[in-house]
Amino acid sequence: MCLMLIDKAMTASATKENRIIKKIKTKTLNMLEVKNLHAKIGDKEILRGINLTINDGEIHAIMGPNGSGKSTLSAVLTGNPLYEVTEGEAIFNGKNLLEMKPEERANEGLFLSFQYPVEIPGVSMTNFLKAAVNEKRKYQGLPELKAAEFIKLMNEKRKVVELDSKFTRRSVNEGFSGGEKKRNEIFQMAMLEPKLSILDETDSGLDVDAMRIVADGVNKMHTSETSAIVITHYERLLDMIKPNVVHVLYKGRIVKTAGPELAKEIEARGYDWIKAEVGE
């Protein structure tokens, strides 16, 4: 009887320990945790209480009508100085994202693919990326890549997004078509190997073939340790980049969250039924 009680006690203790370990592991999986985030530009409040949790390896899609705050959310997370955070918090891998400068956020592993990529005349893609890659390595305490090492890395990564080598010799995005600019953004993402990528309407203006190349590049780079936020109006991109979770952002708040089926329902029904549900 005594041995039985001891055995039960040991089993209970082990079970409790396993629960604690599981809880700790679960807790550390949160890559990004946004709580009650409010932000404004000038006197206009745009984000009105965003709550969002993204774990390692997850892809989250954010959809919503025009003017809902989708691009504002990406701008705030990456540190655009035009926006002022008035309330809430954003924790990225255990660190306060809102206290970091934009370049620190990038070096910590945050990447934004712009809806309208900018041109930088006079700065070659090769020099631009070499500076960015080595800056991140310096931040991480790693030595700079030598010229041969960098060229090798660049050649490997451009194959991922099917980017012709001639683009790496040109100025950043100068004279690029819309599709080439978007593909170039994904190439930059491949070079920088971010932990969390934010794709802000990357599919905007792309034909089906260009969209497939971009989506394939994103999928090839996705691992169990990297995550992504895909901001889009269209379900067709989400047929290529499979999200774990789909959110609807409306009037500065996430008003609905579900699985990939939500994107298909929005494609079929639009947003009016969601507006009716939230009573606005």
Q: PLM features: residue spans?
A:
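Walker B catalytic motif
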Residues: 198-202, 209
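The feature captures the beta-strand-to-loop junction immediately N-terminal to the Walker
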Residues: 63-65
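ABC ATPase C-loop
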Residues: 189-190
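Conserved beta-strand-loop-alpha-helix hinge in the C-terminal portion
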Residues: 245, 249, 253-276
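Conserved hydrophobic segment flanking the Walker A/P-loop of ABC-type ATPase nucleotide-binding domains
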Residues: 54-56
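ABC ATPase NBD Q-loop/coupling interface
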Residues: 89-105, 173
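Conserved structural motif at the start of ABC-family nucleotide-binding domains
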Residues: 32-34, 47
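Q-loop/switch helix immediately C-terminal to the Walker
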Residues: 112-116, 122-138, 150-153
